[in-house]
Amino acid sequence: MKILVALAVFFLVSTQLFAEEIGANDDLNYWSDWYDSDQIKEELPEPFEHLLQRIARRPKPQQFFGLMGKRDADSSIEKQVALLKALYGHGQISHKRHKTDSFVGLMGKRALNSVAYERSAMQNYERRR
C-alpha cells in the first residue's frame, strides 16, 4: 500500500515539474496583448468563421426526428397518394380522420369526452381504495 502511495506522489510531482518546464517557455505578455485588434484578427482566420457559420446553420428538414419517428427522405406526398389510390382504387380519397373519444399522447391514453374521463377517473379511484 505504501508503495502505491509513493508511486502516486512521485507521478504527481513529476507531472507538476514537467508542466512548469513547458509553462516557462510561454510569453509573459500574452494576456496584456489580448485586446490588440490585429491579434484578434490573426486568432480568428476565415476557416474558423466558416466553421461557426456551419454550426449556426439550420439543419435540413429530413434531419429532424419527430415523435412519430424518422421521416423517409425519399418519400413524397405524390408517392403516398399513389399508394393510397392503389390500395383503395381510383376513387376520391377522403382525408378525414376517424375521431374517437380518446387519444394516446405522451402522457398516455386520455379521453376527449369529459364524462367518460370522469367516469374512468372515478373507477380508478375506487379500485385504489
Curated annotation (Swiss-Prot):
<dbReference type="GO" id="GO:0006954">
    <property type="term" value="P:inflammatory response"/>
</dbReference>
<dbReference type="GO" id="GO:0050671">
    <property type="term" value="P:positive regulation of lymphocyte proliferation"/>
</dbReference>
<dbReference type="GO" id="GO:0007616">
    <property type="term" value="P:long-term memory"/>
</dbReference>
<dbReference type="GO" id="GO:0008306">
    <property type="term" value="P:associative learning"/>
</dbReference>
<dbReference type="GO" id="GO:0005576">
    <property type="term" value="C:extracellular region"/>
</dbReference>
<dbReference type="InterPro" id="IPR013055">
    <property type="entry name" value="Tachy_Neuro_lke_CS"/>
</dbReference>
<feature type="site" description="Cleavage; by MME">
    <location>
        <begin position="63"/>
        <end position="64"/>
    </location>
</feature>
<dbReference type="GO" id="GO:1990090">
    <property type="term" value="P:cellular response to nerve growth factor stimulus"/>
</dbReference>
<dbReference type="GO" id="GO:0010634">
    <property type="term" value="P:positive regulation of epithelial cell migration"/>
</dbReference>
<dbReference type="GO" id="GO:0010459">
    <property type="term" value="P:negative regulation of heart rate"/>
</dbReference>
<feature type="site" description="Cleavage; by MME">
    <location>
        <begin position="64"/>
        <end position="65"/>
    </location>
</feature>
<keyword id="KW-0964">Secreted</keyword>
<comment type="similarity">
    <text>Belongs to the tachykinin family.</text>
</comment>
<dbReference type="GO" id="GO:0007267">
    <property type="term" value="P:cell-cell signaling"/>
</dbReference>
<dbReference type="GO" id="GO:0098992">
    <property type="term" value="C:neuronal dense core vesicle"/>
</dbReference>
<dbReference type="InterPro" id="IPR008216">
    <property type="entry name" value="Tachykinin_fam"/>
</dbReference>
<dbReference type="GO" id="GO:0019233">
    <property type="term" value="P:sensory perception of pain"/>
</dbReference>
<dbReference type="Pfam" id="PF02202">
    <property type="entry name" value="Tachykinin"/>
</dbReference>
<dbReference type="GO" id="GO:0043025">
    <property type="term" value="C:neuronal cell body"/>
</dbReference>
<feature type="site" description="Cleavage; by ACE">
    <location>
        <begin position="65"/>
        <end position="66"/>
    </location>
</feature>
<dbReference type="GO" id="GO:0032224">
    <property type="term" value="P:positive regulation of synaptic transmission, cholinergic"/>
</dbReference>
<dbReference type="GO" id="GO:2000854">
    <property type="term" value="P:positive regulation of corticosterone secretion"/>
</dbReference>
<protein>
    <recommendedName>
        <fullName>Protachykinin-1</fullName>
    </recommendedName>
</protein>
<feature type="site" description="Cleavage; by ACE and MME">
    <location>
        <begin position="66"/>
        <end position="67"/>
    </location>
</feature>
<dbReference type="GO" id="GO:0030424">
    <property type="term" value="C:axon"/>
</dbReference>
<dbReference type="GO" id="GO:0008217">
    <property type="term" value="P:regulation of blood pressure"/>
</dbReference>
<feature type="site" description="Cleavage; by FAP">
    <location>
        <begin position="59"/>
        <end position="60"/>
    </location>
</feature>
<dbReference type="GO" id="GO:0009725">
    <property type="term" value="P:response to hormone"/>
</dbReference>
<feature type="modified residue" description="Methionine amide">
    <location>
        <position position="107"/>
    </location>
</feature>
<dbReference type="GO" id="GO:0007268">
    <property type="term" value="P:chemical synaptic transmission"/>
</dbReference>
<keyword id="KW-0027">Amidation</keyword>
<dbReference type="GO" id="GO:0031835">
    <property type="term" value="F:substance P receptor binding"/>
</dbReference>
<feature type="modified residue" description="Methionine amide">
    <location>
        <position position="68"/>
    </location>
</feature>
<keyword id="KW-0527">Neuropeptide</keyword>
<dbReference type="GO" id="GO:0045202">
    <property type="term" value="C:synapse"/>
</dbReference>
<dbReference type="GO" id="GO:0007204">
    <property type="term" value="P:positive regulation of cytosolic calcium ion concentration"/>
</dbReference>
<dbReference type="GO" id="GO:0051496">
    <property type="term" value="P:positive regulation of stress fiber assembly"/>
</dbReference>
<dbReference type="GO" id="GO:0032496">
    <property type="term" value="P:response to lipopolysaccharide"/>
</dbReference>
<dbReference type="GO" id="GO:0007217">
    <property type="term" value="P:tachykinin receptor signaling pathway"/>
</dbReference>
<dbReference type="GO" id="GO:0048265">
    <property type="term" value="P:response to pain"/>
</dbReference>
<feature type="propeptide">
    <location>
        <begin position="20"/>
        <end position="56"/>
    </location>
</feature>
<dbReference type="GO" id="GO:0045778">
    <property type="term" value="P:positive regulation of ossification"/>
</dbReference>
